[in-house]
Amino acid sequence: SGERPWKCCDLQTCTKSIPAFCRCRDLLEQCSDACKECGKVRDSDPPRYICQDVYRGIPAPMCHEHE
């Protein structure tokens, strides 16, 4: 499955399969080096990006705890 393209993710969607297939919809200032497909969010100011990769494996922890 390789390296997860994000260390953490707040807006993560994963399948219920084992292993899970996960996507992260967080808006980032820049994608990580591990992200292969980085997409710019249209009309974002300042510019924001979303890693378009699908990761197969253990879901990432959340970046921020929701209170």
Curated annotation (Swiss-Prot):
The record marks 16-17 as: Reactive bond for trypsin. One of its GO terms (molecular function) is serine-type endopeptidase inhibitor activity. The keyword Transcription regulation does not apply. Disulfide bonds join 8-63, 9-24, 14-22, 31-38, 35-51. SMART domains: BowB (SM00269). Keywords: Disulfide bond, Protease inhibitor, Serine protease inhibitor. One of its GO terms (cellular component) is extracellular region. InterPro entries: Bowman-Birk_prot_inh (IPR035995), Prot_inh_BBI (IPR000877). Pfam families: Bowman-Birk_leg. The keyword Zinc does not apply. Coiled coil: none annotated. It comes from the Eukaryota. PANTHER family: BOWMAN-BIRK TYPE BRAN TRYPSIN INHIBITOR. Belongs to the Bowman-Birk serine protease inhibitor family. This is Bowman-Birk type trypsin inhibitor 3. It comes from Setaria italica (Foxtail millet). The lineage of its organism: Eukaryota, Viridiplantae, Streptophyta, Embryophyta, Tracheophyta.
